Each structure stands twice: as C-alpha cells, then as structure tokens.
C-alpha cells in the first residue's frame, strides 16, 4: 500500500509543480519575423487607475486592449468612452468577477458574459469585439465552459507574460517591471497581463518603463 501511495505521488507532483505562472496565449496578428507585444489590462474601468493608464498610453502613442468588468461601467461611462475613442480595444472580461457565481454552470457563465456585453453596448452602441478573457485565465476551466464561450462566437484570450500585479499588491513598480521581464523572457510575440482595477498605483508607475524597454528592444505594440 505504501509503495502504491508513493508511486501515485510521483505521478501527481510533477503535474502540480509544472503549472505555468502565466497562461498560454495565441500570438497576436503579426508578421512572424517581427517582434510584437500586446498590452492588456483587466478589471477596469476604475476612477483611480484607468485614467492614468490612458494618459500614459496617449503620451506614448500606444494602444492597448482592456478586458472590462461590466458592473464597473456604471458611473464610469466617460472612462469607457475615452478608451474607445482613443483607439483602444474593449473586450469582455466579466460582469461580476465572482468566480463561484460565474463558473457554477454553463448558464451562469453565459449570463455573466451577456450582462457584461449589455453594459458595454449601453455606453457604446457601435461597439463590437469577439475577444473574451476568463476571470483568472482559462487554466483549469472545465471543457463545457470553454465550449460555451465558443458557442457564443467569442475567442478566449489568455496571456504569456504578466506583471503579477494582482497577486503581489504590495510590489513596487520596479518589482513589477522585473516580473514582466522574467515572464516575457525572449518571446517574440508577447501578450502582457496587467490590471487597471482599484489600487494599482505601482502598475501605473511601472508602465512607462515597460513601454520604453520593449520599444528599445524593437517590439511593435499591437492590439489583440
């Protein structure tokens, strides 16, 4: 019996330790010979963070993709409108960001997505985008839930580099910059995860340095 338990652990432990720090992502639309990076921001819009992110992006002439929380659009319609009018891509993230409510069933996931879509369309009637990001990423999401997203004609997009700002809320801007570099590695096509939720001051502070670094390395900034 002891040998059987040991053998089982030897099979399971490698699978647990090999879980990636960042999720896989399809390469952005780009010439395969050209290095590219897509900046993506989850969990906005917010009053405290999103406008500062937009100011920096405008100053640097860089476009980004914002994965929106639908319930946060109310009272922040002008921020969402600004994202759209300044040429950024607005995509569906979630309405509530409450994992238990979202992932209970195919119907609860579908309802959450539709509510988010409705909140965006109420502000931007001409908006159209087929991108979706699972709250927490698609790692470990049940197959039937992934299929629900496909049936809704949406493309689920994860990431392959991250500032780790959501899991390290006390990190300094320099530390977030280090996380970005270590997770991006030498990838030719990068989809970078950051957040514009409440309290992401260090993300705002790190963003100019992140943009400068990848620009100097010859990366082209693209929308998803």
Predicted regions and their residues:
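Sec/Tat signal peptide C-region and signal peptidase I cleavage site
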Residues: 19-25
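Catalytic domains of cell-wall/extracellular-matrix polysaccharide-remodeling enzymes
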Residues: 52, 97-193, 197-215, 219-220
């Amino acid at each position: 019996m002891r040998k059987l338990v040991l053998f089982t652990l030897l099979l399971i432990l490698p699978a647990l330790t090999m879980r990636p720090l960042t999720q896989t992502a399809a390469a952005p639309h780009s010439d395969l010979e050209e290095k590219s990076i897509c900046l993506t921001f989850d969990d906005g819009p917010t009053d405290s963070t999103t406008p500062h992110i937009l100011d920096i992006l405008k100053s640097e002439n860089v476009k980004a993709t914002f994965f929106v929380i639908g319930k946060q659009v109310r009272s922040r319609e002008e921020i969402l409108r600004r994202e759209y009018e300044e040429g950024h891509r607005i995509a569906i993230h979630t309405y509530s960001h409450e994992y238990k409510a979202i992932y209970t069933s195919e119907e609860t996931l579908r309802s959450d997505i539709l509510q988010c879509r409705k909140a965006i369309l109420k502000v931007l009637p001409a908006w159209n985008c087929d991108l979706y990001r699972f709250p927490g990423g698609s790692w470990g999401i049940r197959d039937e839930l992934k299929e629900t997203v496909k049936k809704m004609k949406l493309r689920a997009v994860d990431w392959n580099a991250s500032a780790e700002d959501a899991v390290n809320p006390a990190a300094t801007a320099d530390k977030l910059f280090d996380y970005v570099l270590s997770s991006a590695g030498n990838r030719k096509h990068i989809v970078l995860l950051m957040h514009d939720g409440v309290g992401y001051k260090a993300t705002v502070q790190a963003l100019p340095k992140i943009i400068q670094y990848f620009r100097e390395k010859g990366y082209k900034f693209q929308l998803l």
